[in-house]
Amino acid sequence: MNPANYLFLSALLFTIGAAGVLLRRNAIVVFMCIELMLNAVNLAFVTFARMHANLDGQVFAFFTMVVAAAEVVVGLAIIMTIFRARRSTSVDDANLLKF
């Protein structure tokens, strides 16, 4: 497959994720869209690394996945806290976590 196709797919996935972040109000859906955007960036890194015969993009994508795993833990903990406090996963309720 042509590397341009992978870059087009990466841009498409990033656009879908950005639209989901901007248009959705459910925190879980927004969180999934952020993860989709991170995976799109990883695909672009790996594609550029393959195009230039360099491993730096693949290593950077690996470290991005490690950071994303830690982000999942923290993000889900915050979403669970919002749900326990407000019985809703709406993004609009996120500013209500103040004591």
UniProtKB/Swiss-Prot annotation:
Its EC number is 7.1.1.-. It catalyses: a quinone + NADH + 5 H(+)(in) = a quinol + NAD(+) + 4 H(+)(out). The chain crosses the membrane at residues 3-23, 28-48, 59-79. The gene is nuoK. NDH-1 shuttles electrons from NADH, via FMN and iron-sulfur (Fe-S) centers, to quinones in the respiratory chain. The immediate electron acceptor for the enzyme in this species is believed to be a menaquinone. Couples the redox reaction to proton translocation (for every two electrons transferred, four hydrogen ions are translocated across the cytoplasmic membrane), and thus conserves the redox energy in a proton gradient. This is NADH-quinone oxidoreductase subunit K. Disulfide bonds: none annotated. One of its GO terms (biological process) is ATP synthesis coupled electron transport. NDH-1 is composed of 14 different subunits. Subunits NuoA, H, J, K, L, M, N constitute the membrane sector of the complex. Keywords: Cell membrane, Membrane, NAD, Quinone, Translocase, Transmembrane, Transmembrane helix, Transport. It is found in: Cell membrane. The keyword Protease does not apply. Pfam families: Oxidored_q2. GO terms for cellular component: NADH dehydrogenase complex; plasma membrane. GO terms for molecular function: NADH:ubiquinone reductase (non-electrogenic) activity; quinone binding. Belongs to the complex I subunit 4L family. It is a multi-pass membrane protein.
